[in-house]
Amino acid sequence: MFKIIPALFLLISSTFLYAESNVSTEQEIQIFDDTHRVISEYVYDISNSVDNLLSGEFFKEKNEARKNVNYKDEDSLDAFFQTDKFKSETSQTYLRMRIESNNQSKTSDKNKIKLRAHLPLSKTKHVLKLFLKSKKDNNTTKNDSNTKNAKTIEFNSKYSIGASSFKPYLKARYFIAYELGNNWSFEPAQTFRYSYNDKFEETTDFYLDKKLSKVQLLRFQVSRHTKQHHSGMDYNFATQMFWKLPKKSAFSVSQNFWGNTKYKYDLNKPTYGGISDYATSFNFRQNVWKKWFFYEISPGVNFHRMYNYKPNYNARFFLDIYFGRTYIR
């Protein structure tokens, strides 16, 4: 991971360094492309090696050629906005560098540079599925006639390792999608996550989606979350509307209600189990250069119990650079 940092710095600064030289624009772009390609291949090779090692295929596929994979979810609005749902369920390998500016009326402004890595364990998942299937077959009774006629539900699963700001984690997600008809779909999901800093945490999500058109999606989401060494249970109710726009851009509106069953921000006051934060946000995101450079603008307002539910206006700005097998629109 640390080998990538100098290359990242080179990628960002090379434009300014070459702007004062006599190098042509085409050469500058080629330098960007070459640097991005080297980092992306490095990220993918690490992910593939880890997956091969955990699945027992490290020596079999050590010299496996890199393949161009077409992901069925790469044109979805979840993929474009990089929602938590997409990041938990995608099979893509990527490293994201985010330059973030967060300005709020109630607190001081925050500017950060974040690194996030996602390495899917697709081959390891396949080995686990074969293992569980063999166990199931060994325990199958002779009464197969009823079993064949019974309607079964097959759960999907995703396993991955990753890092958020150099904090590694392991993640497992189990989910199933129901098509309800009339362009409605329902998906319950359960996620387990373990990291060195946050220890064990788990999240339950319920998504109810309505595809209004090819470029519009309405979503209702209910979530709950618990974390080791943290009191109470977090919960969230959200309504979101997504639109695809021309010129590789998209827009969304979100209304969220957050709470905790044992919320406490003042030691002299009892815990509070109701809604502690109401938030409305607007997001505009655009792919501005190549297939891996995005920006996002997100103004909004929230009403938090900490501020006696007085409005806290905020404006966030992101610059996202992706490496690896990333979202392509």
Residue ranges with predicted function:
Residues 20-329:
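Transmembrane beta-barrel domains of bacterial outer-membrane proteins
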Residues 1-20:
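Classical Sec-dependent N-terminal signal peptides that target proteins to the secretory pathway
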